[in-house]
Amino acid sequence: MAYRELKQKHRALREVFHTNLSLRTHRALSWLDRAEQSAGDLDAQFIFLWIAFNAAYATDIDEQYRSTEKGMFESFFKKLVDLDSEDRLYHLVWAEFSSSIRVLLDNQYIFQPFWDSHNGKVPEDEWKQRFQLSKRKAANALGNRDTVQVLSVVFRRIYTLRNQIIHGGSTWSSQANRSQLNDCTALLFKVIPVLIDLMMDHPEQLWGDAFYPFLADD
């Protein structure tokens, strides 16, 4: 399911949606559309897809929690997986992207403590210990087919890649990060339409106030 089909569904249902859900999905779909139009520019596609994800899940939260955005992923994915009666997210994780996910989880360049060590914030042995611990936890989640935990860990890694690009820590179209960028973009292209669709399928759920709500006089 891609932008066009999802947008038709949104137009058909938005009148019965809460304003916050309608705004979230409208914004997310606009960025998904832009990502689909950016074929040939992997960096742009990744950025637009991340914005689409952010538009769908982010809520207006306390400043102290906003600085730990990564901590929000698990509760969001748990809600989606619980609502996913057709196991679409399960299928994506365990059928389509199982190999790619294992590669991503073994990639130190999208593990934030690696860069913290490189920048002198933590000792080298500390990031290595944390990396091994993270991989063991991920392996346990993979072994237990824990879709929520696997998606949460993967999106924390994607978040690090997002930071590298958004904060100017990467060169456009650089070969240095192509492997992880390819894998992350492919995963986002499949996961984001599913999560938008699940949200629209469940307007009765509380999805939270929209981040930066629309103001008529803006």
Q: What function would you assign to each model-found segment?
A:
Residues 29, 43-50, 74, 98, ...:
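Non-catalytic, well-ordered alpha-helical scaffold segments
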Residues 30-37, 47-58, 157:
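Short, hydrophobic/amphipathic alpha-helical patches that form generic packing surfaces
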